[in-house]
Regions:
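The N-terminal extracellular segments of secreted preproproteins, especially immediately downstream
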Residues: 29-30, 64, 117, 130
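Bacterial N-terminal signal peptides that target proteins for export
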Residues: 2-16
Length: 170
């Protein structure tokens, strides 16, 4: 391991240890509510509406490009922004899961294997996100967690897909 990377790693471990110790030493109940996650909203659409109308109503900018948008969700694209593939989504605000739904969804059996609840109107079984939404309350709560949702340019959301965050070389 490169010496500077080793030093960075050691500082990171020390910081995590200090944070963990600080949390453990915090007054009883102090952090329990902070780390619980969403226990209220099961509707992804309702969560998006609450964020739009009650949280970011006075600061409407997209996450990655800092592009402003109005109450009608019209985006002022930043200078130089172009897309060849997702043109219909370029001027549209969408809500991005910072941790992609697939990354937590694939741990649910309904996502991987389906559920008896998941059949279409012809009786054909289905699985994946649609099945997890329909049949698993924990998935719905996670999908609707407002700490994981941010407004983005639709074309950027489409391009990112379910990829994790990472560092890009300049």
């Amino acid at each position: 391991m490169h010496p500077s990377l080793f030093s960075f790693f050691n500082r990171g471990v020390a910081s995590i240890f200090a944070l963990s110790f600080g949390i453990a030493a915090a007054p009883n109940g102090f952090c329990s509510d902070v780390f619980r996650g969403n226990e209220t909203f099961q509707s992804f659409n309702k969560a998006k509406k609450i964020l739009e109308h009650q949280v970011i109503f006075d600061h409407r900018v997209t996450l990655y490009c800092n592009a402003p948008f109005d109450k009608d969700k019209w985006i002022s694209l930043p200078p130089g922004f172009t897309t060849q593939v997702h043109k219909k989504r370029a001027n549209r605000v969408e809500w991005e899961h910072v941790l992609p739904a697939e990354n937590f969804g694939r741990f649910f059996p309904e996502w991987r294997e389906g559920s008896p609840m998941c059949t279409d109107n012809r009786g054909a079984p289905f699985k994946g996100r649609k099945c997890a939404e329909k049949s698993n309350i924990t998935f719905r709560l996670m999908q609707s967690d407002m700490y994981n949702l941010f407004p983005v340019i639709g074309a950027v959301n489409a391009e990112r897909g379910n990829k994790n965050f990472g560092l890009l070389s300049a």
